[in-house]
């Protein structure tokens, strides 16, 4: 991952928020939604949510603008074990402005690297974001 491909930097406050989120002790579903501040050329925090299901989360995402999401999900495995994977979701809806798409796509890898996440997914429509979709994606990481 070459730093020369970075389009936008990550806001230092967001870096700290991501660090705290990564080590949170709560056992509920939670999310951080991030956006690109075009004027500052920076990825910034847009909103935080506690006790939010995938279906509720998708209602918080714009249908025509990209967003980055870090989602802490209470995942109950088939054998009864419970884990709390941190998922990075890049919402990149069809029909976004090409300039926006490039800013987000060019900033994604750096943000994933800073957040230290390995479960990285992309959705092309907010309708894709639901519990079934998320469980299918997470099943790959067993």
UniProtKB/Swiss-Prot annotation:
Keywords: Acetylation, Growth factor. GO terms for cellular component: cortical actin cytoskeleton. The modification N-acetylserine is found at residue 2. SMART domains: ADF. GO terms for biological process: actin filament debranching; negative regulation of Arp2/3 complex-mediated actin nucleation. Residues 4-139 form the ADF-H domain. Belongs to the actin-binding proteins ADF family. GMF subfamily. This is Glia maturation factor gamma. It comes from Rattus norvegicus (Rat). The lineage of its organism: Eukaryota, Metazoa, Chordata, Craniata, Vertebrata. The gene is Gmfg.
């Amino acid at each position: 991952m070459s730093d020369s491909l970075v389009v936008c930097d990550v806001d230092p406050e967001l870096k700290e928020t991501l660090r705290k989120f990564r080590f949170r002790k709560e056992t509920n579903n939670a999310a951080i939604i991030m956006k690109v501040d075009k004027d500052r050329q920076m990825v910034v925090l847009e909103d935080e949510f506690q006790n939010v299901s995938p279906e509720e989360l998708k209602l918080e995402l714009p249908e025509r603008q990209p967003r980055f999401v870090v989602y802490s999900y209470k995942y109950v495995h088939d054998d009864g074990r419970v884990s709390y994977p941190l998922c990075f979701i890049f919402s990149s809806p069809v029909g976004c402005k090409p300039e926006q798409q490039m800013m987000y796509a060019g900033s994604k890898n750096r943000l994933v690297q800073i957040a230290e996440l390995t479960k990285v997914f992309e959705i092309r429509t907010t309708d894709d974001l639901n519990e079934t979709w998320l469980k299918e994606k997470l099943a790959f990481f067993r």
